[in-house]
């Protein structure tokens, strides 16, 4: 789904930075002759192109890259504006920022806490934050729309359980590791995601559990 929305804005860069997803969803399609992957966690990083570091203090000179990808990264960063300013700093003028963030603060749960999130976003909130950092947003849309009813129901159930003390306390494994999905359910969810991909190839979607955004540095 990320690829459907954001790959058209990659172009043919020579210098590209992939922040926070050394072994993540962008490995197969976000590429360049000189690609650098940066992550706080050294696992999955392969020197010399894999660098351990923080988006709050990127170890690169100004205007080092033509494209920067940051998928499910900015929600981990506090202060948010420092992270976005750093992403802007290492991009050359006219460079492209591609990012994704989780949607809707009302969907906040122990999963967010355990994974080190500081916030969730609406589309307007994500657009405003990126524009303040000196970008012009060229596309911003929600994703995972077809599976959103199931996502919303699961988060509502978590909220009720937490409020009334049902289901016992959440341990780290409960909130970080996703529970196994039955093959039939997994097949249905993948089918719904394929519907999203087809729709996103033609238009933006009005709601979903993630926000996908492409922007150009002024």
Region spans (language model):
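A structural helix-start
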Residues: 77-81, 101
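Conserved S-adenosyl-L-methionine
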Residues: 135-145
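Conserved N-terminal segment of class I S-adenosyl-L-methionine
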Residues: 1-63, 67-71, 82-84, 179, ...
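A C-terminal cap/extension of S-adenosyl-L-methionine-dependent methyltransferases
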Residues: 147-218
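A short His-aromatic
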Residues: 72-76
């Amino acid at each position: 789904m990320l690829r459907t929305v954001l790959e058209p804005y990659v172009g043919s860069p020579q210098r590209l930075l992939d922040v926070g997803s050394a072994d993540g969803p962008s490995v197969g399609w976000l590429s360049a002759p000189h690609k650098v992957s940066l992550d706080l966690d050294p696992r999955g990083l392969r020197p010399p192109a894999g660098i351990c570091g923080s988006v709050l203090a990127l170890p690169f000179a100004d205007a080092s890259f033509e494209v920067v990808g940051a998928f499910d990264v900015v929600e981990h960063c506090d202060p948010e504006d420092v992270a976005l300013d750093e992403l802007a700093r290492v991009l050359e003028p006219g460079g492209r920022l591609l990012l994704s963030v989780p949607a809707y603060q009302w969907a906040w749960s122990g999963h967010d806490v355990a994974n080190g999130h500081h916030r969730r976003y609406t589309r307007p909130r994500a657009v405003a934050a990126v524009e303040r950092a000196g970008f012009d947003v060229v596309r911003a849309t929600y994703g995972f729309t077809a599976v959103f009813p199931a996502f919303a129901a699961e988060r509502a159930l978590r909220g009720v359980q937490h409020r009334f003390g049902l289901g016992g306390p959440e341990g780290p494994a409960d909130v970080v590791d996703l529970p196994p999905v039955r093959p039939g359910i997994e097949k249905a969810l993948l089918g719904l995601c394929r519907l999203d991909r087809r729709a996103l190839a033609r238009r933006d979607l009005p709601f979903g559990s993630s926000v996908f955004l492409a922007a150009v540095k002024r």
